[in-house]
Swiss-Prot record:
Name of the gene: serS
Organism of this sequence: Mycobacterium leprae (strain TN)
Record-level GO BP terms: selenocysteine biosynthetic process; seryl-tRNA aminoacylation
SUPFAM superfamilies for the chain: Class II aaRS and biotin synthetases, tRNA-binding arm
Name of this protein: Serine--tRNA ligase
Entry annotated with the keyword Disulfide bond: no
Amino acid sequence: MIDLQLLREDPDVVRRSQLSRGEDPALVDALLTADTARRAAISAADSLRAEQKATSKSLGAASAEDRPALLERAKDLAEQVKAAETTQAETAAAFAAAYMAISNVVLDGVPTGGKDDYAVLDIVGDPPPLSNPKDHLELGEALGLIDMQRGAKVSGSRFYFLTGRGALLQLGLLQLALRLAVENDFIPMIPPVLVRPEVMSGTGFLGAHAEEVYRVDDLYLVGTSEVPMAGYHSDEILDLSVGPLRYAGWSSCFRREAGSHGKDTRGIIRVHQFDKVEGFVYCAPTDAEVEHQRLLGWQREMLARIEVPYRVIDVAAGDLGSSAARKFDCEAWVPTQGSYCELTSTSNCTTFQARRLATRYRDASGKPQIVATLNGTLGTTRWLVAILENHQRPDGSVRVPPALVPFVGTELLESPR
């Protein structure tokens, strides 16, 4: 949720943010109206309760002559208080709905526009000089690494098996990511992948993208370990006196991909289940932008270790999720597509998620304040696409990046004999 003080003092900032996202600025006025109505209802109910309390007190000392009128007034006040409390509850519900409808306020400098209006910040490495490259699925099947056919037989479309050294390649990649995280003071974590609705909602994943989320009974399957790690410290006051608190969560992730019909249907680029190591940071809001750059730096270090060409983009406001105030993506070159494909994203969510989840820290004066939260991918299944396609050789084998050789057990992936 956004900062109500900012809304009340400078609503134009929020309106401009809504416009830059391509969202309705009228939602800001609806929230202001709901806020005014809620506060008025609270004040009215409080005044009536105070009068009711005073009247009840007067009854004890009232004379026989005054008592009937006071009793009548007490009865009338009881009805008024009941009605006022109903109004208070209704205005509170309307306010909560209006409040949840507003996305995070976009930071200054974020490109305006939609999906294709990103700004390219850096390009690293050159596409490999491949003639007639094979795609990752053709390579994966020929080398005994990926089995989509049996994945579909067992679970349906967009499911797969990673087999043999394909499994080792992913496990090695994620272990490498976790090792990098630990070297940089992240606390490793294997979180639950089923979460309560209030945690999923608190992270902003039950808004426009609710159709992407699987539900099992009264719990939700996470599409990223960002969700349980954001909920980990809900309703807590953190000690950030020694600096940001960093976690690295390794989990399976689940997505319906409801909005991607017909897109990336071949192979493992866009699937219903995958594995990921996600970095998550709690910090003071004043440290958030610096921490965002650190997360991006660690992502770039991981990409350097797997030796693939990539670019960094500053995602446009209209392509941001509701929780993100700014997001950087690292996109690797995919030879068979002749284009870049997202491998990582890192988002600065400022205080938006933490305000919903009531996560705070104590400032220098000891006063509780809302923390900032950030997240960033450190490794995921999709990275295998870039590794296989960029490191393929003319004979159909694939060179294993040296950083992954100790995990995979070979320098070259070749057809099984």
